[in-house]
Amino acid sequence: MTRQSTVDQNQSTYNAKNFITKERQESKLDIDQLNVFLENGEQEAKLTHDLIEEIINDPILKTDTDHYDITKSQEREITARRIARLSLYMEHDVKTKQREFKDDLVKNLERKDSKLLTNKDLSIFDRRLSLVANIDPGLSTRIGVHLGLFGNCIKGNGTDEQIHYWLQEKGALLLKGIYGCFAMTELGHGSNVAQLQTTATYDPSSDTFKINTPDLLATKWWIGGAAHSATHTTAYARLIVNGKDYGVKTFVVPLRDEKTLNLLPGIMIGDIGAKMGRDGIDNGWIQFKNVVIPRQFMLQRFTKVIPGSPPKVQTQPLLDQISGYSALLSGRVNMVMDSFRFGSKFAIIATRYAVGRQQFGPEGNETQLIDYPLHQYRVLPQLALCYLVAPTAHKLMGTYISTLMELHQAGADKAKLINVSNKLKDLFIDSASLKATNTWLVAKLIDDLRQTCGGHGYSSYNGFGKGYNDWVVQCTWEGDNNILSLTSAKSIVKKFADISRGKNTTVTTDSLKYLTPQFIGKSLSKDLTFKFDNKKDFTEIWAVMIIRLIHHVVELISKGTKIDSLSKTLVQISKFHAIHSMLLTYQDKLNNESEASVKDAYTKGYLWKLYELFSLYFIDQHLGEFLLLKVVTSDQMSQVLQPRLLQLLPEIRKECIALTDAFKLPDAMINAPIGYYDGDIYHNYFNEVTNNNKLEPDGAGRPPYYPLLTSMLGRDDFQNRLGGSFESETLDSLLK
């Protein structure tokens, strides 16, 4: 509790908002065109705006700064209430997409002859969930685990009949009937899925499986939704038939009674407890003891157990391989979109604060933070990152949806399955690389931008603390970033090696088109130089860097170096692949008049400036590698690249407020008073602090534990506590 302010808040010294008002008045950027560019089209921009308005005006979903003060228990309850609220939107969103409002959607889906809902049918709700994640990531995850992990595991591994039964007849796809979680990770294994220890042993006498947790390390761990809410799980377990281990497969296992939520026989579940962030998620642990499920609860698109004497296991190797690529793609693709939306929020906060905040300089006319060159270097490249990731996020999502559609349409056609398998492999490379790189970059963005806001960035009410704690789990779950980077890089290196040997290698995505004999030869030429007199150079230099890094790795391996000892370089290859992919997608979009939606030349010019800044900033960040592999020379760096970088910063600074406005995020989505639209950082911040920490009637500010303080301050002199008798020698030693 604090004493009420005695300061006149209308004094003219509170002028932070004047700076932002002035910047907006002087801006020449077309905000609407920028927003359409960021949202991937006019209709998409309108949909995003409409959904945001619904979210911030919904009394259950809207989030204020008092959310930063709630306890874990309160957050769990709020999250449950919001899940129930979002379930009401879901049916409406599907009907809106299908343009059918008369029929009872739930009953239609339950019919055995009903068509399976597609990703397109769910696209409006998916967008709603993506936007909700900006203000409540835990809420988005709770539903995302059910729809994205539980649901997509069934979609990816189940037969059409199983998909229809679990997702439509049982109601899961509309958050009805059952609630699912995803039991892959165990206490002893996470990334190494092949070594998971939970078992599913087939019993031919009853045509059932027995699910068991053989030891402590096999306990399912970190399972979102398990602690309190999930009625079912998709469990990853080792298929055991006739004593033979067929590896890890997927099974639907009931956990709780659907009506009472009481645990079923053989199920033991506990709460993981406090975490760094996302306390709205009820992460739990699960142990199984002789849990019996019907054979039909094994997801059988790729592997089947055929009853008989003896029973047989039928596996389609190609399809089983596809299963390995498709299982976790959804989450990784969504995390790239999350990187765009979540990163944008903090770029807005830090940029607006940097414009409104003054520090040092003449009295009464101190310098705005954003006018310091170092501050520009700390803030503006992070803003550029948010612009660069947007087109890539939209493209990756589109590729993911179209590839999964091809997979389901391929049926048993081997040629089509081989084609879609190649696409899934390349999509795995891109999604793994982009997920890892962007979640790392946004984690760094949040903390770096927090520091640019000084002490005020440390306040919970300005969002950085909770934002960081909520975000960094993205660097670990659904594929640890280092493991994903290593895996994607090894796949890229293998493609390079195959091409170098003259082997026919399929490349299905634009981001990997640098893997051609012609470009490899060009990249390894000692005569290659970049003048940076055209836009293409800012992207191509990254492709050359990747080729030279890969060539370096391949040479070392050929001389006997173990590939694991080159892990640091492999992670760099993956990061550089992601940066190149983002630059290439952004460049292609700007060059495509029909896609870019930016007709105003001045506005388009600034999009190009952001493109150049992004490329140059990361070259500067990785200067050692570029110099070591002679992709650039020290003269180029000192005479061309760094001067251009330093030239771009003040140019972009001129329009930085308009560039934040283009995201069109209202204050209720930002939820940080130093980043609100009006720029009145001090009034907004002071008011939020005092509103959330109510004043005592007498303004005394005396805490409930005041006796501890008063007894300490009013304690006796130490002479009295020592009994009033001591030698001067003892006193001297005590006073030293």
UniProtKB/Swiss-Prot annotation:
Protein name per UniProt: Acyl-coenzyme A oxidase
Pathway entry: Lipid metabolism; peroxisomal fatty acid beta-oxidation
Keywords: FAD, Fatty acid metabolism, Flavoprotein, Lipid metabolism, Oxidoreductase, Peroxisome
Organism this protein belongs to: Kluyveromyces lactis (strain ATCC 8585 / CBS 2359 / DSM 70799 / NBRC 1267 / NRRL Y-1140 / WM37)
EC number(s) reported in the record: 1.3.3.6
Sample GO molecular function, one term: fatty acid binding
Gene3D superfamilies, alphabetized: Acyl-CoA dehydrogenase/oxidase, N-terminal domain, Butyryl-CoA Dehydrogenase, subunit A, domain 2, Butyryl-CoA Dehydrogenase, subunit A, domain 3
InterPro entries: ACOX_C_alpha1 (IPR055060), Acyl-CoA_ox_N (IPR029320), Acyl-CoA_Oxase/DH_mid-dom (IPR006091), Acyl-CoA_Oxase/DH_mid-dom_sf (IPR046373), Acyl-CoA_oxidase (IPR012258), Acyl-CoA_oxidase_C (IPR002655), AcylCo_DH-like_C (IPR036250), AcylCoA_DH/ox_N_sf (IPR037069)
Pfam family, one: ACOX_C_alpha1
Family assignment from sequence similarity: Belongs to the acyl-CoA oxidase family.
SUPFAM superfamilies referenced in this protein's UniProt entry, alphabetically: Acyl-CoA dehydrogenase C-terminal domain-like, Acyl-CoA dehydrogenase NM domain-like
Localization of this protein: Peroxisome
Cofactor: FAD
Superkingdom of source: Eukaryota
GO terms classed as biological process: fatty acid beta-oxidation using acyl-CoA oxidase; lipid homeostasis
Catalytic reaction equation(s): a 2,3-saturated acyl-CoA + O2 = a (2E)-enoyl-CoA + H2O2
A GO cellular-component term linked to this record: peroxisome
